[in-house]
Amino acid sequence: QCWDISVTGDFAYVGNDDQGLRIIDISNPLIPTLASTFLSTPGVKFEHAQVIDTLAYAATQSGLFILDVSDPAAPVQLGHSPAENGAWSVHVVDTIAYLPKVFEGIRMVNVADPTNPIELGYFQTPDAAYWMEVVDTIAYVAERFSGVQILDISDLTAPDSVGMLSMDYADALYILGDSMYVASSSWGLKQVDISDLTAPVLVNECKGGGYPVDIQAA
């Protein structure tokens, strides 16, 4: 079962549940080949990974793993930040990793030293936090059963809620300028005006078929 995929250069990084993090060579899109698989401990579920330069940050049911993927055929574990009940996704900005933990809120981890990640702060969301995006000092958190919460994270030790968009099934989101695009597994795609962070406004929606749980915009 594949939970999520991210692409960097000629390689795709796939969170493959309890099969680990699979790194796939897609230099020839017609013939993708498995370059390697990283599995820390048998049974640990890998959900999502973000790759920056030669480092991969993987969200798992055992917390955050930081890997050296300079050689995609032989990933090497550098560090691990354990988290009870794990993390659903990971979002790294500068030297901070943000980890939505479903019903256990959001963890913020300093990853300046990949071999020694250090937890900086924590915010308990009122609902299941699945996905988030960070722009400057603002975090947008998709809370699956209640909507999107907007946080001021200028002080990482004490994030503060500044706005909320109520909706059912906010599974993922993407920020583009003053617009936020939200994928909802029940309601399709929603476009939200976030020019006023304290009062986000739904401006458009597309109720297509299927079960959208992720989104990318450009």
Model-derived features with residue positions:
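Feature marking well-ordered beta-strand scaffolds used for ligand recognition
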Residues: 1-218
